[in-house]
């Protein structure tokens, strides 16, 4: 069996490689996908990809496995970054990492290797199970690290080639394995934030592409102007960090795109702006449309929290979702990801928040 392993330079993908080797497979080649935008934005921050590559080289040397670098910066910009910029300009809250997996790691990369390999291995925290020649995406053992949210838009064809060796492990167990076998990157910290930015701050990326435009910050309850901001595209509904005003905490509860106004509220009044009903479209089902929508739960952001909900099919590509509890940060552009027990069924894009 010929196996391709996607190495990032981090601990997770390195332990995934080790576990495949430990199973006795020998026909293995590693790939590092270069998608960072920091060549373009090098004046903003330091470039991590050389550091990543140093760790990739060290890990491959330890296990005597060949590796290759593939540059996907152009594809990434066209398929993921341009979408992110467009969503921000439209006042939405994008989820670029979902498309990173669908369109680049398991899209452009699969096209590049063109059926050369029987299996592609990564360090994602998720599980793929097979039944009756169909593939099912399941949550990882580690519910905190679980990445099924970001893998929710995979196709059956993509899943047929994938294996996630870390799906049955806790992060603490992965760290311990790295120490036990003395991996070169055993003490490296986990990466944070959006995958294509590296060490670039998100707001610097936004500023580079969309610029700045002064606008007012208004307290929702009083209508009083209590500050200014540099553009609505820097803010998302539910945001608390980065408002930088005294007498907090403050939360972003509404955006007026036409007037470039950010509305904020104190925590004690914030619940009045919470919503529970919204519409989603651009629906993707991993195993086709379910026969019923009973006992569904959804996530509206990466993390452990799931909501019980009711789903109502309005049209072929339109679903109304009603949560059992209100949420403070539902925003157009986010993705609602569907679950039944531990199975991830797919997801859809939020485009209208109702009540």
Curated annotation (Swiss-Prot):
EC number in record: 2.8.1.13
Record field: catalytic activity: S-sulfanyl-L-cysteinyl-[protein] + uridine(34) in tRNA + AH2 + ATP = 2-thiouridine(34) in tRNA + L-cysteinyl-[protein] + A + AMP + diphosphate + H(+)
Cellular component terms (Gene Ontology): cytoplasm
Keyword Cell membrane included in the entry's annotation: no
Site feature Interaction with tRNA, where: 124, 334
UniProt-annotated location(s): Cytoplasm
Residues at the active site: 100 (nucleophile), 195 (cysteine persulfide intermediate)
Keywords associated with the record: ATP-binding, Cytoplasm, Disulfide bond, Nucleotide-binding, RNA-binding, Transferase, tRNA processing, tRNA-binding
List of residues binding ATP: 6-13, 33, 123
GO biological process: tRNA modification
GO molecular function terms noted in the UniProt entry: ATP binding; tRNA binding; tRNA-uridine 2-sulfurtransferase activity
Segments of this protein annotated with the region Interaction with tRNA: 145-147
Disulfide bridges in this chain: 100-195
Cited SUPFAM superfamilies: Adenine nucleotide alpha hydrolases-like (SSF52402)
Protein family per UniProt: Belongs to the MnmA/TRMU family.
Cited function: Catalyzes the 2-thiolation of uridine at the wobble position (U34) of tRNA, leading to the formation of s(2)U34.
PANTHER family in the cross-refs: PTHR43052, TRNA-5-TAURINOMETHYLURIDINE 2-SULFURTRANSFERASE
Protein name, entry field: tRNA-specific 2-thiouridylase MnmA
Organism field: Borreliella afzelii (strain PKo)
């Amino acid at each position: 069996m010929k196996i391709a392993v996607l190495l990032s330079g981090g601990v997770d993908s390195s332990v995934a490689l080790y576990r495949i080797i430990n199973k006795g497979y020998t026909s293995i080649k590693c790939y590092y996908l270069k998608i960072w935008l920091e060549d373009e934005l090098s004046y903003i921050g330091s470039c991590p990809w050389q550091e990543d590559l140093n760790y990739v080289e060290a890990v491959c040397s330890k296990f005597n496995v060949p590796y290759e670098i593939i540059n996907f910066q152009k594809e990434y910009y066209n398929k993921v970054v341009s979408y992110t910029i467009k969503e921000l300009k439209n006042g939405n809250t994008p989820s670029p990492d979902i498309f990173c997996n669908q369109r680049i790691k398991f899209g452009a990369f699969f096209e590049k290797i063109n059926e050369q390999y029987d299996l592609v291995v990564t360090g994602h925290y998720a599980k793929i199970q097979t039944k009756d020649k169909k593939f099912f995406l399941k949550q990882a053992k580690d519910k905190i690290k679980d990445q099924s949210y970001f893998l929710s838009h995979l196709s059956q064809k993509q899943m047929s080639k994938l294996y996630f060796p870390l799906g049955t492990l806790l992060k603490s167990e992965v760290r311990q394995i790295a120490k036990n076998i003395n991996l070169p990157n055993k003490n490296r910290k986990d990466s944070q934030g959006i995958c294509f930015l590296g060490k670039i701050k998100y707001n610097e990326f936004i500023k580079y592409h969309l610029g700045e435009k002064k606008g007012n910050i208004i307290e929702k309850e009083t209508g009083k102007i209590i500050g200014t901001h540099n553009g609505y595209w820097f803010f998302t509904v539910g945001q608390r960090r980065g408002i930088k005003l005294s007498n907090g905490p403050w939360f972003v509860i509404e955006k007026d795109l036409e007037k470039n106004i950010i509305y904020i509220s104190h925590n004690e009044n914030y619940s009045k702006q919470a919503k529970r009903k919204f519409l989603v479209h651009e629906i993707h089902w991993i195993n086709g449309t379910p026969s019923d929508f009973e006992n569904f739960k959804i996530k509206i952001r990466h993390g452990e929290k799931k909501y019980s909900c009711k789903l109502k099919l309005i049209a072929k590509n339109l679903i109304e979702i009603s949560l059992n509890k209100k949420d403070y940060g539902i925003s157009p552009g986010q993705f609602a990801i569907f679950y039944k027990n531990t199975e991830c069924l797919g997801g859809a894009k939020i485009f209208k928040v109702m009540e």
